[in-house]
Amino acid sequence: MGKEKIHINIVVIGHVDSGKSTSTGHLIYKCGGIDKRTIEKFEKEAAEMGKGSFKYAWVLDKLKAERERGITIDIALWKFETSKYYVTIIDAPGHRDFIKNMITGTSQADCAVLIVAAGVGEFEAGISKNGQTREHALLAFTLGVKQLIVGVNKMDSTEPPYSQARFEEIQKEVSTYIKKIGYNPAAVAFVPISGWHGDNMLEASDKMSWFKGWKIERKDGNASGTTLLEALDAILPPSRPTDKPLRLPLQDVYKIGGIGTVPVGRVETGVLKPGMVVTFAPPNLTTEVKSVEMHHESLPEAVPGDNVGFNIKNVSVKEIRRGYVAGDSKNDPPKAAASFNAQVIILNHPGQINQGYAPVLDCHTAHIACKFNELIEKIDRRSGKKLEDNPKFVKSGDAAIVKLIPQKPMVVEPFSNYPPLGRFAVRDMRQTVAVGVIKAVDTKEISGKTTKAAEKAQKKK
């Protein structure tokens, strides 16, 4: 069998009509998990509806619709393989909660693929001041997605088709604006593609003989190639944070007859093993882990990325809930936050945000109202430089450092220590009004309970 391929996550971003669905659909279609029968079924439906020309996007639309109806269709459909990696597409904008998902996202993307349309007038629309392209790219960078690939799509609809001049014009302009955001254009592969016809997707196109391939320079090693698939292969593999202390935000807590209380969640950092003594914050409740399971099989240890259930002793299902975080009681255990400072970017708020504003924050699995207790400073959203102290208010487009106070017990961490617990979405009026990255946290000591099982386990050690 040989060694299993490394799993990586990508997020696909870009303007509505850039052809994200078609390009993504093409990759999944050609290298991916969609079985032939499903494809044939979709193709037949597409043809019957006169959508023959739309087949890749149609495949993706079907998947998306099923995903949104809450039917968890075989998630393998969102995966495809390159020669080096198993790639999972964790989300594609256009989903209603894209921004929220990207932030509280169950997984951090290792790389963003930005699709821009090269068609006449299309590129300009996507990148204009109010186009989504900038917003998505800024969001990806702010949330720590440091690798980027740019697919210049719809090369078949430039004037003349497959125009070298148009590709170079777009490459130049996109380079300028991703540089402003913080990406280094020299480390970004720019690939001229047609997601529809398949040019430079998996195989080099014979229509763009002028394209001598993409090159990237970075301190972790240079790379070059021709196709989008090769660019995905050149992504630097993520280092999964097993060496950090354990952080496991709870998604659910079950009571299982004959077993007892079983919290479920995804290991974000560190490892979880049977026999470990864990502390749940905010209530500061300490107990022993009896067993750890994934897909109904017991595990000797769970590592970052694993979605697990674990059985704990002497704790009732009423004492812990979704949004709580488990950690190793002997190694920097999580604590309740009294307040925290964060850098926020206001995305779409119809009015002004003043001191005292108390929207709901979505951070990891927690969903808790937090008060903007102090607007500390307004900053330039690209450079981070201070613009003014103690602004009276902030509005859409602004970035600021603010002090937030959770209105109920909550666990958050500085982004620099534990990224998945250090980014959040601010939700109000049924939309994401702001995103934030946590800079510093003031914790509070809560005297919690330690179960008998934990005391016994600690004595044994």
Curated annotation (Swiss-Prot):
The gene is eef1a. PROSITE patterns: G_TR_1, G_TR_2. Its main location: cytoplasm. It comes from Oryzias latipes (Japanese rice fish). GO terms for molecular function: GTP binding; GTPase activity; translation elongation factor activity. The modification 5-glutamyl glycerylphosphorylethanolamine is found at residues 301, 374. Residues 153-156 are annotated as: G4. PANTHER family: TRANSLATION FACTOR. The lineage of its organism: Eukaryota, Metazoa, Chordata, Craniata, Vertebrata. Residues 5-242 form the tr-type G domain. The keyword Nucleus does not apply. Residues 14-21 are annotated as: G1. Translation elongation factor that catalyzes the GTP-dependent binding of aminoacyl-tRNA (aa-tRNA) to the A-site of ribosomes during the elongation phase of protein synthesis. Base pairing between the mRNA codon and the aa-tRNA anticodon promotes GTP hydrolysis, releasing the aa-tRNA from EEF1A1 and allowing its accommodation into the ribosome. The growing protein chain is subsequently transferred from the P-site peptidyl tRNA to the A-site aa-tRNA, extending it by one amino acid through ribosome-catalyzed peptide bond formation. The keyword Lyase does not apply. GO terms for biological process: translation; translational elongation. This is Elongation factor 1-alpha. It catalyses: GTP + H2O = GDP + phosphate + H(+). Residues 70-74 are annotated as: G2. It is found in: Cytoplasm. One of its GO terms (cellular component) is cytoplasm.
